[in-house]
């Protein structure tokens, strides 16, 4: 055995390749061993270092792969099981154990995370050269008993099923011990590169090969100073020196130092200064400004900015002649940067390769299996069924059929297998084609119902049923169609998923064989196997930026290296033990077992491993290195790593460069990036004045960019402070509103127009509606209460009111419409009870009807031949609506209008003046259409009746009598009343001066109401609808005002100038704010002024 070490700036690969070539020259077959994470990259590096650039006698591989070469043709006793099959076997074993048999893990024995932890521990025990029996040394008796029982049962299942899940290295070791491979080992040599520790299994294999006379060369990075040091704790090279010293002691070999002949570079001098800091010695070298220029420390605000600055720098280097393959990008946290990496690097048109496997979880086939599993487990929940259909690989529904089906399922709130098994019957005014929907339902449900009828049966029987199901679901045809327009790379990914799917089913058949399995367990196992599968990823081309985690980097990896995301939280990475065995358990097992057996204790390796990783990172570049840390990662504040801060301390004294937008050619990455940056600079406030040079630069850049975009026919969308709408064409207006027909309006249409003109366009012209639902809503609640009161008032008034109310409630509850609405679920029953309480409370007001009789309910107006008003061009305008109730005053026959409200509503002169509260005046005008009525006579008022359960806070009252009075105040008719009729009205009518009108004032009110309708009619017929939601205070838009942001793009902070300001009283004309009668007169006078214009 030969042990070698060299300075970190001396390429260890070159040294070891030279050793390998000399071994080949003596007739040896050389296996060049690298760690799993580096084997692919190491193969390329070895080939580059070979004098002949290739050699059949040198194989670059991993320990496990090398062992496979020797056992490939071995006739193994059992069937091979991979991790997926092993997981299934553990699952099967655990289901056969009763919950009571496992004192600690009984309740989580089927949990996928627990099964994964058991698999990890199984492999870890193999790697550590330990057996399941060694778990007997655990201290906690219940935990010990459970783990021993589980693994004993797993071992029994492996033997009984003739399965083999042993590692390749263990099998190879058995062959070495038996002497089967002596002839092959005679010409074998090993060169081992990139390790600072061996697992117990790897160490055992190296020992066996050494004893068989195999030549072994092991190399690592370390300085002579570190190796000779008596005290190594805390040294940067502690991990590699400890590794060397242990091997030297075990094999009685003295490590050889390989001197570095070339002159020391900047990174070598910086490394020596850092090493001196950690071993508390004086640095023997000085760092110059030239040295400092080769290592930069960046500080940025967030990940996005950090990646953008890296992208710009890469583009600049490429412009200067650097190849993408000469650049390496390292992440402190790959997960945190992965999504933004694709967005930004695509924007800057930088090809890259992220060297990590990708989960198949988002593939339609995996989602197909997941949806099936959830449908069975949760009994056909709506979202699970829709997710299955939206995978695009189930059934033969067209997109239009799927949309129609989904709309109905959401409308009728179809959940559960029972509802989906029955024909759909619920409808809303015939809006849905039930025959078509039921045909779709049968096509969707038939395969699922047939498959889910499967009970516990053998694995072969279950797989046969599953095969029938996927054929009925046209899975294969749909997957084939999915591939039609995909790229070659995507087609390969689809093939990988199908292979993984088939392999999972094969492993299931192999593990369970003739065992009985429940359908739920089958689907859970298939899903678990699919989620464990990953895509194989290989770079599409050689000339790409290699992207990886910083802890996988080697010294001298690339000429230019960018390491970003190096915050204190992520650099260094603190390995955490999340296994079933604690660090104390591991230490106890290590002490109790053979010296060749050892479980890794991550916490004990953290410090020396992290220091060595940091040193490797500092030496990863051959020309320039950039280390960067953002202030925010995933919107969470973090600080710069202490390793980076150490570089800023004397004598290194590296400056921290705070990256900001700059105006120079270095800041341009590509046309896409330049476009993005110009828009960004245009939108954001600039925190400093631009110099003349910067202004000139951006002016020229914009001109060049515009020419480029114009040549390609691309326009830049303008973000304007003004939202403009297109007017309707005359042909459209004529089709919507023929001149020979009156323009039909309503009080609600009037209010909608004045709230936001574009809202009227959306609701009344485009006819867009909110999603329908079968569940009772505010409208159905109102109809329910209206129906009760209608029946009460139609009954014989000589009967007791409470009896009439009970009869009306009973009859209304039994009506088909309301019975289906309010008997569907416990929630709807509870809602009905609240409505009945409201009906009884409101009924107390109806009971006090002395001097009043009801002569009409749900009375429709606006159907008479006489129009509501005539426009100046002779166009007729009619106003339609429905009055909840018309009352007659017995004293003189005058009429009044009642409108039921489910919430507190009051008449407001200000809102009426601005067109937002015209309901009551419109109803008063409508009464005049009734036969025998003269304008402005025989009216006593228009009012709201609040249909709610009155609530009074007792803390606001002094005694119980006050609470009763407060309740009485809330249960009153509130609205507009004629002053000369107030004496004839009872106590249930709110009598206030502000809402008491004279006949003359009523006439002004109704005349102004016509003006409002005239403005709306003229605006609609003009065909132009502004985006102008109203603002009450001129500072913001109230949350209850529809802004339709998703359609219009309206943003209050940008477009508030377009909002309609409400007209208000000029308070400067009054000594103090008017109230009561003065307030009424002020608004009536303002209306007169408008009428006189």
UniProtKB/Swiss-Prot annotation:
Pfam families in the cross-refs = ADDB_N, PDDEXK_1
Provide the GO biological process annotations.
Answer: double-strand break repair via homologous recombination
> What are the protein's UniProt keywords?
ATP-binding, DNA damage, DNA repair, DNA-binding, Exonuclease, Helicase, Hydrolase, Nuclease, Nucleotide-binding
Enzyme class per UniProt: hydrolase
* Names of the cofactor(s): Mg(2+)
For this protein, the record's SUPFAM superfamilies field holds: P-loop containing nucleoside triphosphate hydrolases, Restriction endonuclease-like
Q: Which GO terms describe its molecular function?
A: 5'-3' exonuclease activity; ATP binding; double-stranded DNA binding; helicase activity; hydrolase activity, acting on acid anhydrides
Q: Which superkingdom, per the lineage? A: Bacteria
Keyword Nucleotide-binding on this protein?
A: yes
What Enzyme Commission number does this protein have?
3.1.-.-
Query: What InterPro entries does the database record attribute to this sequence?
Result: ADDB_N (IPR049035), DNA_helicase_suRexB (IPR014141), P-loop_NTPase (IPR027417), PDDEXK_AddAB-type (IPR038726), Restrct_endonuc-II-like (IPR011335)
One further remark on this entry is: Despite having helicase-like domains, this subunit does not have helicase activity.
Assembly behavior: Heterodimer of AddA and RexB.
Q: What does this protein do?
A: The heterodimer acts as both an ATP-dependent DNA helicase and an ATP-dependent, dual-direction single-stranded exonuclease. Recognizes the chi site generating a DNA molecule suitable for the initiation of homologous recombination. This subunit has 5' -> 3' nuclease activity but not helicase activity.
Question: Which family does the similarity line name?
Answer: Belongs to the helicase family. AddB/RexB type 2 subfamily.
Its recorded name reads ATP-dependent helicase/deoxyribonuclease subunit B
Its source organism is: Streptococcus gordonii (strain Challis / ATCC 35105 / BCRC 15272 / CH1 / DL1 / V288)
Q: Tell me the name of the encoding gene.
A: rexB
């Amino acid at each position: 055995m030969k042990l070698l070490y060299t300075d970190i700036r001396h390429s260890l690969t070159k040294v070891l390749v030279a050793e390998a070539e000399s071994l080949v020259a003596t007739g040896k077959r050389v296996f060049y061993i690298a760690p799993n994470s580096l084997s692919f990259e190491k193969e390329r590096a070895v080939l580059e270092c070979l004098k002949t650039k290739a050699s059949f006698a040198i194989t670059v591989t991993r320990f496990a792969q090398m062992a496979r070469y020797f056992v490939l043709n071995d006739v193994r006793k059992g069937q091979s099981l991979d991790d997926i099959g092993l997981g299934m076997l553990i699952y099967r074993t655990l289901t056969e154990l009763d919950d009571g048999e496992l004192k600690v893990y009984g309740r989580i024995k089927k949990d996928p995370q627990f099964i994964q932890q058991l698999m990890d521990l199984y492999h870890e025990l193999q790697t550590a050269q330990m057996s399941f029996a060694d778990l007997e040394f655990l201290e906690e008796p219940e935990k010990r008993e459970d783990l021993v029982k589980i693994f004993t049962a797993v071992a029994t299942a492996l033997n009984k099923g003739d399965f083999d899940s042993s590692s390749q290295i263990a099998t190879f070791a058995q062959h070495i011990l038996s002497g089967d491979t002596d002839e092959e080992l005679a010409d074998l040599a090993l060169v081992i590169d990139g390790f600072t520790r061996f697992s117990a299994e790897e160490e055992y294999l190296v020992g066996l090969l050494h004893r068989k006379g195999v030549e072994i060369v092991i190399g690592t990075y370390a300085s002579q100073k570190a190796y000779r040091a008596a005290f190594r704790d805390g040294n940067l090279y502690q991990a590699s020196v400890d590794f060397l010293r242990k091997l030297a002691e075990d094999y009685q070999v003295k490590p050889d130092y390989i001197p570095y002949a070339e002159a020391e570079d900047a990174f070598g001098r910086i490394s020596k200064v850092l090493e001196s800091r950690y071993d508390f010695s004086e640095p023997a070298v000085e760092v110059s400004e030239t040295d400092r220029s080769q290592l930069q420390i960046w500080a940025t605000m967030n990940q996005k900015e950090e990646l953008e600055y890296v992208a710009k720098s890469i583009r600049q280097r490429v412009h200067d002649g650097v190849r993408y393959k000469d650049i390496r990008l390292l992440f402190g946290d790959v997960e945190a940067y992965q999504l933004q990496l694709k967005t930004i690097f695509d924007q800057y048109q930088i090809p890259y390769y992220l060297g990590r496997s990708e989960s198949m979880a988002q593939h339609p086939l995996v989602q197909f299996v997941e949806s099936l599993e959830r449908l069975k487990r949760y009994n056909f929940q709506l979202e699970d069924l829709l997710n299955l259909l939206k995978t695009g690989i189930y059934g033969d529904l067209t997109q239009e059929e799927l949309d129609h089906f989904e709309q109905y399922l959401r409308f009728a709130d179809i959940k559960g297998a029972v509802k989906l098994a029955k024909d759909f019957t619920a409808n809303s005014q015939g809006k849905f084609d039930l025959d078509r929907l039921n045909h779709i339902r049968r096509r969707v449900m038939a395969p699922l119902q047939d498959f889910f009828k499967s009970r516990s049966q053998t694995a072969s029987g279950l797989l046969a049923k599953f095969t029938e199901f996927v054929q009925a679901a046209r899975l294969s045809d749909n997957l084939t169609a999915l591939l039609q327009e995909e790229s070659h790379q995507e087609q390969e990914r689809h093939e990988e998923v199908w292979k993984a799917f088939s392999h999972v089913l094969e492993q299931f058949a192999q593990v369970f064989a003739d065992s009985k399995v429940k359908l739920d367990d089958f689907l859970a196992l298939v899903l678990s196997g699919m989620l464990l599968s990953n895509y194989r990823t290989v770079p599409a081309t050689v000339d790409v930026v290699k992207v990886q985690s910083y802890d996988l980097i080697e010294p001298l990896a690339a000429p230019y290296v960018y390491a970003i995301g190096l915050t204190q939280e992520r650099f260094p990475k603190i390995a955490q033990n999340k296994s079933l065995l604690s660090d104390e358990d591991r230490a106890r097992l290590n002490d109790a077992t053979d010296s060749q057996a050892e479980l890794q204790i991550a916490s004990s390796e953290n410090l020396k491993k992290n220091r060595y990783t940091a040193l490797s990172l500092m030496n990863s570049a051959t020309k320039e290195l950039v280390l960067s840390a953002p202030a925010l990662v995933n919107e969470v504040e973090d600080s710069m790593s202490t390793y980076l801060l150490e570089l800023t301390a004397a004598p290194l004294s590296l400056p921290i460069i705070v990256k900001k937008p700059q105006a120079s050619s270095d800041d341009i990455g590509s046309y896409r990036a330049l476009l993005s940056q110009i828009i960004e600079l245009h939108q954001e406030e600039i925190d400093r004045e631009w110099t003349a040079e910067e202004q000139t630069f951006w002016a020229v850049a914009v001109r060049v960019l515009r020419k480029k975009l114009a040549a390609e026919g691309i326009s830049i969308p303008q973000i304007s402070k003004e939202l403009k709408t297109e007017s309707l064409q005359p042909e459209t207006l004529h089709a919507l509103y023929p001149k020979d027909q009156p323009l039909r309006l309503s009080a609600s249409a009037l209010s909608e127009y004045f709230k936001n003109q574009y809202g009227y366009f959306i609701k009344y012209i485009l006819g867009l509606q909110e999603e329908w639902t079968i569940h009772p809503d505010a409208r159905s609640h109102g109809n329910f209460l209206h129906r009760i009161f209608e029946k009460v008032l139609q009954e014989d008034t000589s009967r007791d009111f409470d009896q009439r109310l009970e009869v009306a409630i009973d009859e209304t509850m039994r009506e088909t419409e309301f019975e289906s609405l309010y008997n569907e679920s416990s929630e709807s029953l509870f809602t009905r009870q609240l409505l009945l309480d409201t009906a009884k409370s409101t009924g107390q007001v109806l009971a006090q009807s002395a001097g009043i009789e009801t002569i009409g309910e749900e009375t429709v107006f606006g159907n008479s031949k006489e129009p509501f008003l005539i426009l100046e061009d002779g166009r007729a305008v009619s106003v339609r609506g429905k009055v909840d109730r018309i009352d007659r005053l017995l004293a003189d026959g005058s009429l009044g209008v009642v409108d039921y409200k489910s919430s507190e509503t009051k008449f407001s002169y200000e809102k009426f003046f601005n067109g937002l509260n015209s309901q009551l005046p419109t109803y008063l005008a409508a009464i005049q259409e009734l036969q025998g009525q003269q304008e402005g006579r025989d009216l006593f008022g228009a009012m709201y009746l609040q249909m709610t359960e009155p609530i009074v806070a007792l803390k606001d009252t002094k005694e119980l009598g006050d609470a009763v009075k407060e309740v009485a105040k809330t249960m009153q008719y509130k609205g507009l009343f004629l002053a000369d009729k107030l004496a004839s009205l009872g106590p249930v009518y709110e009598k206030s001066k502000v809402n008491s009108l004279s006949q003359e004032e009523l006439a002004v009110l109704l005349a102004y109401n016509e003006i409002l309708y005239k403005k709306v009619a003229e605006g609609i017929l003009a065909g132009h609808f502004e985006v102008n939601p109203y603002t009450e205070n001129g500072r913001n838009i109230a949350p209850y005002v529809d802004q339709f942001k998703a359609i219009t793009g309206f943003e209050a902070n940008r477009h508030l100038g377009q909002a309609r300001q409400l007209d208000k009283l000029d308070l400067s004309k009054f000594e103090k704010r008017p109230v009561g009668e003065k307030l009424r007169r002020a608004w009536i006078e303002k209306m007169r002024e408008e009428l006189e214009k």
